[in-house]
Amino acid sequence: MSRKPKILYVVQNLSGGVLTYLTSLCNALKGSYDIVIGYAKDKDSPADVESMFDPSIPMYSMTTFDREGNLLKESAARRELRDIVEKEHPDIIHMHGYKAGMIGRKALDGMGIPMFYTPHGYLYLSETHNLLSRSLYRSNEANLARCDCMTIACSKGEFAETLGFTRNATYVNNGIDVQSIQKVIDAHEPREHPFTVYTVGRINEQKNPVLFNEIARVMNDVHFVWLGDGSWRERLTAPNIEVTGWLSREDSLHRCLDCDVFILTSLWEGLPISLLESMYLRKLCIVNNVVGSRDVITNGENGYVVDSAAAFVNAIHHHKDPQSARMIEAAFRDINEHYTVDAMAREYSQIYQEALAEETA
């Protein structure tokens, strides 16, 4: 029997939507590929993160992987990553996130192994960073795009940004495991609850808890829930906001089912898993007008795309309109047609196989 090709996934932050994305992708690909994961663990990562993956998958916690740009640690991280490559001999390397892409391409360019990079949201798109920082992030992306590495964007919007750096690029929409979600839906016993607006994810700069808090303060008679935790938790000061802390994926889905309207206030995105899941759960989805979110939601067709706290509030007030019910069903259909993990895995596998064929040609 021939050996299965081996993929090394390098991940800068194994938590939130990226964690859900990667566990689903690994489960879908493990029959055709051997998989190895090198990852950074931060305060937002679940303590038992390795137990969320199939036990056949070797996991390397990269202790030198520093998100804050420490040059000494960056050099050590490159050495640590090269050590993993020398030990595991992967046939394919796929890096996820800005820091993973930067360290991986610097460390491994020229080794003759097919490499891929998925940004999951370009940092330079965030308007909360000053102009100098955004310029530096963009410059780094442009310089590293010269490496022998294909960028696989996770949405059409991210792909359009990528083409500003390189033509060695394609895109694969993120997808969700609808079968596992359906099992939760089928087992769910609805609970009585007040009208509830919710979001899911890390409470950090990217997810924009300041805007979420502003919306909650305006709608002070509505219950708001943030499913998750993070370093910006103290920004959620409105008394009508409940912060759940980190929950298991199944418990989080059950809580989502007992909520009514999903909002995503993010400042930038790749293609948000929490949005895809809420669309499948048949929740009205209202998103900030940013790359990634607006690639999935078309305003007035399968949800609302808005630009301000006032516009979020106005859209929430329309949740009982007949038009909103039609949009909810349109969003559900979109998931089944375009955003399943099976479709995502097929497209990734095709890209990987084409790269392997070129190596052996």
Predicted regions and their residues:
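Conserved donor-binding/catalytic core segment of Leloir-type glycosyltransferases
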Residues: L8-V10, P190-K207, N213-R217, V225
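Aromatic "clamp/platform" in nucleotide-sugar-dependent glycosyltransferases that forms part
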Residues: L267
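Nucleotide-sugar donor phosphate/pyrophosphate-binding loop at the beta->alpha transition
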Residues: S75-R79, P114, Y124-N143
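Conserved acidic donor-binding segment of nucleotide-sugar-dependent glycosyltransferases
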Residues: T298-A310, H317-P322
